[in-house]
C-alpha cells in the first residue's frame, strides 16, 4: 500500500516529482544570496511554494532540482535554462559554481549593481517603511583583481593528490580545488599553486589550517596559522618563497594577538588615500576594506555628504584604524574616533601621528554595542556623526540618539553619514533614526565593494532640523 501524498503536493504542478521530468519555473527576482526566486502555481491557479533556485536569474524559465523541501518553500539548483535572461553572462572564472568565493559571475555587472540597489531599497521599505529622498549613484570600480584581503583555507587532501589552498566550496566545509582566482590581485592568484607546493614541503602541512592575506601598497603579507612550531627547514623554505614572490610572512601560533612578522622584517603594510594626503599603515589582521580602489571613492563620497567645516566637531563611531577619522581631521576643527578594540584604537592614534593630524584627533575605546544616551551626552556636543559599524549595525547608538531626541535633554548631530555592510541592520537603525530620533533619510545608495558577490555595502545620509 503506497503512502498518501499531501494535497498541497498533489496540486502543485511545479513541485518536484521523482522519477519524471524536472519541474519548470519562471524566475521573478533574486534574493540576497543571489538565488533566483520563483513561485509554483497550483492546479487551481493559486500561488504555491516559493522556490529558491541557485544559478537562475530574473526573467528566466528554468527546470530545477530541489535539494531541501520545507512546507512553504524549497531550495533548488538549476537543471536546464529554457529561456535565458539578457542579463546572463559567461563567468570569467573556471571554478565558478563550485568555489564559494563568488555568487554573481553569471550576472552582467550593471545588473549586479541594479540588484544590490533593489535589495537596499527593499530592506529600507519592508523593515523600516522608509524611502530615501534621493537614491545616490552607485559607487563601483574594477570587477576583477580587487580583493586585497582574503582568508584561504589549507587542507592536505590525499584523494586530491596533496595540499589544497583556496576558498571553501559553495555551502561546504570542503576546500575548492582552485588553481587561480579572478577576484584576487593577479600576483596573488598566480601564487596559489606555488603556495600549495610550499605547504606540501613543510613539516607542519597537516597543522596549518589557514592563510590570511593582506595586500598593501608595497608588499603582500601572508599570515600562516600554525598549530605547531616550524623547524629550521621550514624557516628556510619560507624565506626562499618570500624572496622569490616578494611577500612577507607572519606567523600566528594562537589567537589574533599572537600574530608576529617572521620574514622579511624591514617592510610594512599600508594603503593610501591620495585625495586627503593620508598614508595608513596597518597590520595584516587589522580590519581594512577589502577593495582599496572603492574605499578611496567611498571615503571621498562620505566626506562630501558629511560636509565638515573648520568649525565642526565630528564623532567617528566604529573608527577602526582611522579610515574616516584621519581624512575628517584634514577638514574639521576636531574629530573624536571611538572603537571597541584597544588594539585598533592604539593603531588609529599612531596613524594620526604618522599623518600629522594628532592635534585635531582624539581616540577612545568603548563598547559601542552597549552605549546609552547618557554615554553620548557625556562626550559633549558634536555637529556631525560618521557611523561605520560591522554587520551587526549600530543598534545601541541609534537607540541612544532616539532616547536623547525624545527626552529633549542633550545635543544631537545635525547630520549623520552611515556606512553599512548589511542592508537589513541599516534599515533597522534607519527606522529608529527617522521614526524615533527625528531625522530624515536624505539619501542612500550602494557601494559595490565586492563585485561578483551578493554582498551589499551601502551609504546613507540622515539630517535633522
Swiss-Prot record:
[4Fe-4S] cluster binds at residues 93, 99, 102, 181. Gene3D superfamilies: 2.40.50.1070, Nucleic acid-binding proteins, Vaccinia Virus protein VP39. It holds the Pfam family tRNA_U5-meth_tr. The active site is at 421 (nucleophile). GO terms for molecular function: 4 iron, 4 sulfur cluster binding; iron ion binding; RNA binding; rRNA (uridine-C5-)-methyltransferase activity. CDD domains: AdoMet_MTases. Residues 16-80 form the TRAM domain. Keywords: 4Fe-4S, Iron, Iron-sulfur, Metal-binding, Methyltransferase, rRNA processing, S-adenosyl-L-methionine, Transferase. One of its GO terms (biological process) is rRNA base methylation. The keyword Iron-sulfur applies. The keyword Aminoacyl-tRNA synthetase does not apply. S-adenosyl-L-methionine binds at residues 289, 318, 323, 339, 367, 388. It is an enzyme of class 2 (transferase). Its EC number is 2.1.1.190. It catalyses: uridine(1939) in 23S rRNA + S-adenosyl-L-methionine = 5-methyluridine(1939) in 23S rRNA + S-adenosyl-L-homocysteine + H(+). SUPFAM superfamilies: Nucleic acid-binding proteins, S-adenosyl-L-methionine-dependent methyltransferases. Residues 1-22 are annotated as: Disordered. It comes from the Bacteria. Belongs to the class I-like SAM-binding methyltransferase superfamily. RNA M5U methyltransferase family. RlmD subfamily. Catalyzes the formation of 5-methyl-uridine at position 1939 (m5U1939) in 23S rRNA. This is 23S rRNA (uracil(1939)-C(5))-methyltransferase RlmD. It comes from Burkholderia lata (strain ATCC 17760 / DSM 23089 / LMG 22485 / NCIMB 9086 / R18194 / 383).
